[in-house]
Amino acid sequence: SNKVHPMLMTRGVPGTHDVKIMLDFFKKSKSKNFKSIKLPSFNKAVDDRSLKKSWYNIKEQPDVIIFEGWCVGARAEINKTLKKPINSLERTKDQKLIWRKYVNEQLRTKYKKLYSQLNCLIYLKAKNFSLLQKWRLKQEHKLWLNTKNKSSHKIMSKGDVINFMQTYQRITQNMFKFAPKYSTIILNLNSNHQIKTIKYNK
């Protein structure tokens, strides 16, 4: 965030993940000479990785790996579509398109290499972006209820969540449009997180 753009202080968008450690995990998990792997866990309440003593220790070679994340499989946009801001955050905080171009370039390069590790792509598609915001607010409220020492944790307010979600909006809406065309399986969800329909692409 200091070198590129302050908006990269907010985790989640391409360019804020440790792609190297993920690629290393895939490489080691596929190795014929498999050895145990230490895998980080994430603590949302403190908005950072858990201490190493809480990391997962994978002792046996996995048969199946489910690689989950909100932007898994996302693809880069064409540069000209980046010019028009889609929300107030882009309009006020990224007037020179530095953040948008950086995130898009990450998708085009490092994340393309990462997603090439996948054998198939299962896309869970919500009805719209406002529904995703509603679900995220509910998730944060549950986190607040389940956290004992609230003063020492980074639990977000409603306004924080809305701002946080704006950093995700561009890629999410791009996936709404294009991911159903290239995903292996598309699970269309209703407003209660239930699978409404399933589509298979050959």
Segments predicted by a language model, with ranges:
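Acidic-enriched, low-complexity/disordered segments with a strong bias for Aspartate over Glutamate
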Residues: 18, 24, 47-48, 63, ...
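Conserved NTP phosphate-binding and transfer environment spanning the P-loop NTPase/kinase superfamily
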Residues: 64, 71-202
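Phosphate-binding/switch loop-helix module in NTP-utilizing enzymes
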Residues: 27-74
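Generic hydrophobic alpha-helical membrane-segment signal
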Residues: 6, 56-57, 107
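Conserved nucleotide-sensing/catalytic segment adjacent to the nucleotide-binding pocket
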Residues: 1-47
